[in-house]
Amino acid sequence: MSQMPIELKGSSFTLSVVHLHDSQPEVIYQALQEKIEQAPAFLKNAPVVINVAALTAETDWIKLQQAISSTGLHVVGVSGCTDDALKKIIAQAGLPLLSEGKAQRRVVEPVAAVPAAVKTQIIDTPVRSGQQIYARNCDLIVTSNVSAGAEVIADGNIHIYGMMRGRALAGVSGDVQSQIFCTHLAAELVSIAGRYWLSDQVPEAYFGQPARINLNQLDNVLTIKPLD
């Protein structure tokens, strides 16, 4: 049998979500330009999802979309839209409306749980610019340096025993309890479960220092402290 011309498979990707808190195109354009200049390797020409939860139907979406696209970012979808009129405008612009699915409740009989071994992926070589390491369904340990322009990603925790100059994204499948441990922090970006800091948002006192980053469960923001 000849091979089918196409094949559909499920997959997952790490995308930045831009939350809009202003509807003025020129304000959004300037704010995005500043962010791109701070982390060009991460944001230049990047695909993004736009969250419009704070906007209303009075928003001139066409001009707003043009302002975002003119920065070089590629809008691949829109999330957080609850206004029916705004939904229609966005759909007419040819963009998909994204929403977080809610799992259906189901009743299962209790069974004796067998503790699963915690998996860990270990990288013993330097992670160079342009490389991406993804530890799916496990923690990631890097025993060497991570260069600027490199990306280390994990569904669990990330441990970096070297100079961290690239991007570290922990808990990418939504694990808000994931953490980042680093012996020499100089990252372009750190992220836990979608919440992230660019390099200029990391407290200066921790630059080049051993640090531990986690997500505060009370207010859902990143926090940092010395790595003892």
UniProtKB/Swiss-Prot annotation:
Keywords: Cell cycle, Cell division, Septation. InterPro entries: CAP/MinC_C, MinC, MinC_C_sf, MinC_N, Septum_form_inhib_MinC_C. GO terms for biological process: cell morphogenesis; division septum assembly; regulation of cell division; regulation of cell septum assembly. It holds the Pfam family MinC_C. HAMAP family: MinC. Belongs to the MinC family. Cell division inhibitor that blocks the formation of polar Z ring septums. Rapidly oscillates between the poles of the cell to destabilize FtsZ filaments that have formed before they mature into polar Z rings. Prevents FtsZ polymerization. Interacts with MinD and FtsZ. NCBIfam families: minC (TIGR01222). This is Probable septum site-determining protein MinC. It comes from Pectobacterium atrosepticum (strain SCRI 1043 / ATCC BAA-672). The lineage of its organism: Bacteria, Pseudomonadati, Pseudomonadota, Gammaproteobacteria, Enterobacterales.
